[in-house]
């Protein structure tokens, strides 16, 4: 694999878990606002948080308001540059094709996700967008960090929505399928 030098990061499992917990907090905020609970954090090479985001599609009525996009936008503003070289993005759910493409364009070094998205996962599950040799940039991928916590958050959110039957038709279109959910029951975020 042709991984750029700036992507060869040395991060411990404990550091990954610490930052993933912050992404989980963002996901909880999304759920509290009525959005699918997905959260993201962008961390620079020195360990500073430069961007935070959470799913805000319902709040903003914007199909591009995914957690990763929100976090990358904030990181670019914070750094004053669209190239986010040397950064790691922590996200609770595997990025979709749109977000994976944005992460390539932002030149992130590494993507760490909590659980796979079997319907739209684009960095491991269906595609490996961040590792395509044909693209102008590649990034490292690490999955299943705090997997149980990330899956639990999604399951809990959708269980409540099912019980309340609020937006039942929309629910079937919004729920991501993780590798432990019924694939007939859960479309993508």
Which stretches of residues belong to each language-model region?
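Short beta-strand scaffold segments in enzyme catalytic cores
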Residues: 38-47
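A short, polar/charged loop-to-alpha-helix boundary motif
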Residues: 59-69
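Glycine-rich oxoanion-binding loops at beta->alpha junctions
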Residues: 69-76
